[in-house]
Amino acid sequence: MSRRKARELALQALFQMDIAGTDPDTAVAQALTRETEPDWAPDRLEEESAEFARRLVRGAWQHREESDRLIAQYARGWRVERMAAVDRAILRMAVYEIVHSEDVPDSVAVAEAVELAKTFSTADSSRFVNGILGSVIRGMKGAAGADEAVSRD
């Protein structure tokens, strides 16, 4: 299983958690179970990808309030709770990766989120997701630059 597939599974779990109130461990287990074949035997790479999916789900869910604040800040004219649930899950996962995952470049997090939006949401969602995430990144870099300027004084 690739990281892309792990993100798809994480998206399914986050969507289920948001809509049905399922706990993170159950949602991930159900997403992984749906994905497996009867003769499936996890190898090392597959277990690493499954763990990546678990980490994304737990992290995105744990930090959803922080992510929602960032999303709301840059989603002009949109309230997070009024967004399509799948878009909200994609954005939460991507913001979590951008803010908290040092092993994932911002550009990869955005590209993967855009691909998820193209696959699982509406025709306009990929542009919507791309625009919000780009603004989040620019806002964070601007804040980091301001912090550096203040600390040098």
Curated annotation (Swiss-Prot):
GO terms for molecular function: RNA binding. Keywords: RNA-binding, Transcription, Transcription antitermination, Transcription regulation. Pfam families: NusB. The keyword Hydrolase does not apply. GO terms for biological process: DNA-templated transcription termination; transcription antitermination. The keyword S-adenosyl-L-methionine does not apply. Coiled coil: none annotated. InterPro entries: NusB-like_sf, NusB_fam, NusB_RsmB_TIM44. Transmembrane segments: none annotated. GO terms for cellular component: cytosol. Belongs to the NusB family. HAMAP family: NusB (MF_00073). Involved in transcription antitermination. Required for transcription of ribosomal RNA (rRNA) genes. Binds specifically to the boxA antiterminator sequence of the ribosomal RNA (rrn) operons. This is Transcription antitermination protein NusB. The gene is nusB.
